[in-house]
Curated annotation (Swiss-Prot):
Name by which UniProt lists this protein: Translation initiation factor IF-2
Region annotation G1: where it falls in the sequence: 352-359
Record-listed GTP binding positions: 352-359, 399-403, 453-456
Gene3D superfamilies for the chain: P-loop containing nucleotide triphosphate hydrolases, Translation factors, Translation initiation factor IF- 2, domain 3
G4: region residues: 453-456
Chain positions covered by the region annotation Disordered: 1-35, 79-248
Gene that this polypeptide is encoded by: infB
Region G5, annotated ranges: 489-491
GO CC annotation, single: cytosol
Biased segments, Basic and acidic residues type: 1-11, 79-161, 211-237
Length: 844
């Protein structure tokens, strides 16, 4: 239908709508002036044809609707007439039957006249009932027909209105000034505006030269005409303030009746700004809410999970709490650890004071001479070994250093152990590290077995050891306690078998079990960086079986187990519970004490390791920032403090930790040791460059510098020192710190002179005639004047003469004349004390 209308629309006829003429005139001042006048012809639209077509279309639709309604009404009428005819036929049949019955009873009419008269009212009643039924049926049929006709008319009317609206919307685009499309009209108006602007641009210079009020009036009138024309057009198309938008131009979006409350995911910590962004509210709303709760916060302040949850729920949001460690928990939770537990070997840590025989005892047990390689009798790093007994039972030993600097290493060994063997020398008794080992064992909850060593010496006294240990709550079985005391001699092997039996007996009491066939987990005993093999970690397997090729997550590091070696350097393919192995293949050197866990997915293990590194970095930065803020004012008040910068490189991680901790403890209020760098492995060129930049000394503990590092060290004249015993390292660092201390100055009396007489001199004033009673009186040294042993003046000598000669010094027992500078109140009996200032070196 719409296509027909478009076809009937006459084609656009282009006419010249604008004509320009020039009007000449004179101004008020008498000057001639030419004004261009533009005459625009109004657009005419012939709408008769379109209106006729619309009226014709509407009439056709109404006629069709009327025809449909009439057809439906006729059908309903025919149906009603058929029902009426059927009812009438039934009534006629009944009346015929009655009539036939009456004919048969006619011969006896005379006899039954009275009876016939009695039956007539009954017939009349039936007829009346039949008539009433017919009337009701006709009424119902008529109402039904009227209802259907009304519905048909409404349906037809609705169809007609829908067609009208479609025609109006379709014809709207084609009903314009000249029956062209609306889009063509807009394009034409745009072209007109461009032409006008182009004309104005050409005449801009001329207009600027002419100026005057008439030009402004002309421009204003033109702007007004343009504005009026635009307003009329906008009003027609529903644009602008006065325009009414048609149904086709109105937006169908309806504003929601209430604010949508979305779910808010909250991590362990969140800032106020992030919380506001997630809840789609202003941050000021959250700040107001928290002020009502009694908390003063800023927009960038970090709030905890519970507070954020409370605020979000107060504002009507549903909160989803997210655990930031969920990836780590998921990775560590996806492990096969449900296998049956079996009995495992005990892990025994040997502790004790320096040189009490720990390594020698372990050496005898292992039947290997490793103690000869230990420098200075100190175990340099934790060693882990397992030995098999004659009856097939196995014991794993951890050997810890005895020096005071290795406190953290002993603490780690105690945590990973089941039984602590405390080695005490029978001739030396309880020492400081012995007490510390007892404390570590108690903190770890590990039972003690005391090995009283060196009983073969003549001065050995095991009973004294038991008495001394009683003071530290280590009660032997002899005194009613539960601690086994075993006298041994590591040198001769006496009592070693008894010690092993005591260890196995203690392990049976503990009932040690572990999963053997599941995925392995353990603890890092030691770690270091090997130049050829890369990062190496000594891992004590605590449960499960560690196999070659397993993916291991170890603290901040991860990797696949490329190779495993036992304590003898032999390659092994797997290691069960309580077995220590050296593991190769990690991404870096893990920290000693980190948990080592076998996981399924290497990619997820990498993600967990990176997450741990990031979290540790954040905590470290926060701690540093806090320390800076706390120490800012104290550092300002202290002034300059001498600093000794040190770079520490060692063979294993435990030694690095111990040395750094010991160096930090050496710091005093005047000299501080600052460890600018530390690490595991040899000394590299990077370390030398760092030492140059920070003016530090390099300390190598059981490591050496490579060739490139040595060249840089020699060129920059860096102080490089190698050590293999921690005593020497700490003593030399102390000496270096002592050299940085401010020296102390001490006054020493070198001579004493007694005033015997006083002379007056026109040049020097009062001259004291003195006798040197002690030491030497020197001309250039400072002096004090004492009267009745009280200092009344301190200064220097102006002259020192013996007879008439100036001398530099006068010795004991000689007379001299002394002139005191700027002091003339010298009296007989005074004492002149001569002293010198001596620099005294300090040490830490």
């Amino acid at each position: 239908m719409t296509e027909d209308v478009k076809a009937d629309v006459p084609k656009k006829l282009s006419i010249q709508r604008r004509t320009k003429t020039t009007v000449s005139g004179t101004t008020t001042s008498g000057k001639s002036k030419a004004v261009q006048v533009e005459v625009r012809k109004k657009r005419t639209v012939k709408t008769d044809i379109a209106q006729q077509e619309e009226a014709k279309l509407k009439a056709q639709q109404e006629a069709e609707a009327k025809k449909i309604a009439e057809q439906k009404a006729a059908e309903e009428k025919a149906r009603l007439e058929a029902e009426k005819a059927a009812t009438k036929k039934e009534a006629d049949e009944k009346s015929k039957a009655e009539k036939a019955k009456a004919e048969t009873a006619k011969p006896a009419k005379s006899a039954v006249d009275s009876k016939a008269k009695f039956v007539d009212p009954e017939k009349e009643k039936r007829k009346a009932e039949e008539a009433e039924l017919r009337r009701k049926a006709e009424e119902v049929a008529r109402q039904k027909a009227e209802e259907q006709a009304r519905r048909a008319a409404e349906e037809a009317k609705r169809y007609a209105e829908a067609d009208d609206s479609d025609n109006e919307s379709s014809s709207e685009d084609y009903s314009d000034y000249n029956l062209s499309s609306r889009y063509a009209l807009e394009a034409e108006d745009e072209e007109d505006r461009r032409n006008e602007n182009r004309g104005r641009g050409k005449n801009k210079v001329a207009k600027a030269k002419k100026g005057g009020r008439d030009d402004e009036n002309s421009k204003n009138s033109k702007n007004e005409r343009e504005s009026n024309r635009k307003n009329q057009k906008d009003a027609k198309f529903g644009k602008g303030k006065n325009g009414k938008k048609g149904a086709a131009l109105q937006q169908a979006f309806t504003k929601p009746a209430q604010v949508v409350k979305s779910d808010v995911v909250i991590g362990e910590t969140i800032t106020v700004a992030e919380l506001a962004n997630k809840m789609a509210v202003k941050a000021t709303e959250i700040i107001k809410m928290m002020m009502k709760m009694g908390e003063m916060v800023t927009i960038n302040q970090v709030i905890d999970q519970e507070t954020a949850q409370l605020v979000a729920e107060e504002l009507g949001h549903k909160v989803i709490l997210r655990n930031e460690n969920e990836l780590e928990e998921a990775v560590l939770g996806d492990r096969d650890v449900n296998a049956e537990k079996v009995t495992r070997a005990p892990v025994v840590t040997i502790m004790g004071h320096v040189d009490h025989g720990k390594t020698s005892l372990l050496d005898y047990i292992r039947k290997a001479k490793v103690a000869a390689g230990e420098a200075g009798g100190i175990t340099q790093h934790i060693g882990a070994y397992h030995v098999e007994m004659d009856d097939g039972k196995m014991i794993t030993f951890l050997d810890t250093p005895g020096h005071a600097a290795f406190t953290s290493m002993r603490a780690r060994g105690a945590k990973a152990t089941d039984i602590v063997v405390l080695v005490v020398a029978a001739d030396d008794g309880v020492m400081p590290q012995t007490i510390e080992a007892i404390q570590h064992a108690k903190a770890a909850g590990a039972p003690l077995v005391v090995a009283v060593n060196k009983i073969d010496k003549p001065e050995a006294n095991p009973d004294r050891v038991e008495q001394e240990l009683l003071q530290h709550d280590v009660i032997s079985e002899k005194f009613g306690g539960d601690v086994q005391f075993v006298p041994v001699s590591a040198k001769k092997g006496t009592g070693v078998d008894d010690l092993l039996d005591a260890i196995l007996l203690q392990s049976e009491v503990l009932e040690l079990t572990a999963v053997k066939d599941g995925m392995a987990s353990g603890v890092v005993i030691e770690s270091y960086l090997d130049k050829g093999r890369g990062p190496v970690a000594t891992i004590l397997v605590q449960s499960g079986t560690l196999r070659k090729g397993d993916i291991v997550l170890c603290g901040f590091e991860y990797g696949r187990a490329r190779a495993m070696r036992d304590e003898n350097g032999k390659e092994v393919d797997e290691a069960g519970p309580s077995i220590p192995v050296e593991l190769l293949g990690l991404s870096g050197v893990p920290a000693a004490g980190d948990e080592a866990t076998v996981v399924r997915d290497e990619k997820k293990a990498r993600e967990v390791a990176l997450y741990r590194q990031g979290k540790f970095r954040e905590v470290k930065l926060a701690r540093q920032q806090k320390a800076k803020l706390e120490n800012m004012f104290s550092n300002m008040s202290e002034g300059d403090v001498a600093e000794l910068n040190v770079i520490v490189k060692a063979d294993v991680q435990g030694s690095v930790e111990a040395i750094v901790q010991a160096l930090n403890e050496l710091s005093t209020n005047e000299v501080k040791v600052k460890v600018v760098g530390s690490g595991v492995g040899g000394i590299t060129e990077t370390d030398a460059t760092l030492a140059t930049a920070s003016n530090a000394i390099i300390v190598g503990f059981n490591v050496r510098a490579d060739a490139t590092a040595r060249r840089v060290i020699e060129a920059e004249n860096i102080d490089l020192r190698y050590y293999s015993i921690i005593y020497e390292l700490l003593n030399e660092i102390k000496a270096a710190m002592s050299g940085m201390l401010e020296p102390e100055f001490k006054q020493e009396i070198i001579g004493l002179a007694e005033v015997r007489d006083v002379f007056r001199h026109p040049k020097f004033g009062a001259i004291a005639g003195c006798m040197v009673t002690e030491g030497v009186v020197k001309r250039n040294n400072p002096i004090r004047v004492l009267r009745d042993n009280v200092v009344i003046f301190e200064g220097e000598l102006e002259s020192l003469r013996r007879f008439k000669d100036d001398v530099s010094e006068v010795r004991n027992g000689m007379e001299c004349g002394i002139g005191v500078k700027n002091y003339n109140d010298v009296k007989v009996g005074d004492q002149i004390e001569v002293f010198e200032v001596v620099e005294v070196k300090r040490s830490i």
